[in-house]
């Protein structure tokens, strides 16, 4: 995986964040797909305060099975929150890269998830199926990371 990290808070090790991101990518997408994905991880102070979000993920190249992504993350999170949030956002990278999630360019508020269209202006955030999947699996992925790091 091609990974660039910007504005990493000094309380975190560059190697740790790199290894964690690569672990999540390989675990979610397998080595073959993960090796063809590029992620730009950007930390921003006050992101949650200005946007209401701890983090978000967006594709940068093409909405049909994209390979280039940016993940924006609030720089003021603690370690567990950051690693769990990164797991959540990497699940979205997997959803986009595998073609499970696709933003509809002709209708910006509509996304297709596993073949079904959803207007996210008319649904609560937690009822969006791609968010349900990310929320339901982020902690398990984080726990798998902790087990992996014990080895």
Where do the language-model regions lie?
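Histidine-centered divalent metal-coordination motifs
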Residues: 88, 92
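Surface-exposed helix-capping loop/turn segments at secondary-structure junctions
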Residues: 28-35, 100-102, 145-151
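Long, well-structured alpha-helical subdomains associated
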Residues: 120-151
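Post-HEXXH active-site segment of zinc metalloproteases
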Residues: 80, 84, 96-130
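Hydrophobic beta-strand residues in large extracellular and virion-surface proteins
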Residues: 17, 37-41, 69-71
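Hydrophobic or amphipathic, alpha-helical segments that drive membrane association/targeting
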Residues: 1-12, 39-49
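Zn2+-dependent metallopeptidase catalytic core
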Residues: 12-36
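Active-site scaffold of zinc-dependent metalloenzymes
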Residues: 46-80, 93-97, 101
């Amino acid at each position: 995986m091609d990974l660039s990290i910007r504005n990493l808070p000094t309380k975190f090790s560059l190697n740790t964040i790199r290894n964690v991101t690569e672990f999540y990518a390989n675990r979610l997408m397998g080595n073959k797909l993960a090796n063809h994905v590029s992620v730009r991880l950007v930390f921003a102070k006050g992101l949650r305060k200005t946007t209401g979000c701890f983090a978000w993920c967006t594709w940068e190249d093409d909405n049909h099975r994209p390979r280039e992504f940016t993940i924006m993350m609030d720089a003021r999170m603690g370690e567990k929150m950051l690693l769990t949030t990164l797991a959540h956002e990497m699940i979205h990278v997997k959803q986009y890269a595998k073609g499970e999630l696709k933003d509809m360019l002709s209708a910006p508020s509509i996304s297709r998830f596993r073949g079904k269209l959803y207007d996210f202006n008319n649904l609560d955030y937690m009822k969006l199926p791609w968010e349900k999947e990310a929320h339901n699996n982020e902690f398990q992925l984080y726990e798998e990371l902790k087990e992996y790091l014990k080895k």
